[in-house]
Every structure is written in structure tokens, then in C-alpha cells.
Amino acid sequence: MGIADYFRERRRSRRGSASVAKERLQIIVSHERAERGGPDYLPMLRQELLEVVRRYVTVDPDAVRVDVERDGPHEVLELNITLPEREEEGAQR
């Protein structure tokens, strides 16, 4: 491998990282657009669900995610809650 090959290889890898960066940016932009187009009630729904879950489990507000996906004529409400890990049995007693 000569020095010229080394620089050619570096150029190829830069193109690869540029395409990866572009793809990631497209994902972020599409996610932001999807959030803007969501129903107006989602923030209130998220807050109320968080209050209900907190009656039973201590949950971080960032651990609740509410999304609406469109599948043809149907809308699907997706709710994800990351629950805290259980403590050991001996520590609770």
C-alpha cells in the first residue's frame, strides 16, 4: 500500500460518513415533521397518562412516549413507558 492508496482510501471513507450523516439528518427531519403533524391532544394525553402511571410506579417524565402512526385509513396510538428496574427483594423488606 503506497501513500497515494492511503489518501484514496481516506477519501472513500469520507464519502461514506457523509452519506451516513445525510441519512441521519433525513431521519431527524422526518421525525420532526411527523411530530408537527400530530394531533393537538397528544401533549395533554401524555401528561394524563404519566399522572395515572405515577399513582403506581415512580416514572421519569421523559420515560413516557406517545405516538400516533397512520396505516392507510387507520390511526394507531402507540404508548411506550420505560419502567424503572425492580429493586432486589431483600432491599424492599
From Swiss-Prot:
Keywords: Cell cycle, Cell division. GO terms for biological process: cell division; regulation of division septum assembly. The keyword Cell cycle applies. Pfam families: MinE. InterPro entries: MinE, MinE_sf. Prevents the cell division inhibition by proteins MinC and MinD at internal division sites while permitting inhibition at polar sites. This ensures cell division at the proper site by restricting the formation of a division septum at the midpoint of the long axis of the cell. Belongs to the MinE family. NCBIfam families: minE, PRK00296.1. This is Cell division topological specificity factor. It comes from Halorhodospira halophila (strain DSM 244 / SL1). The gene is minE.
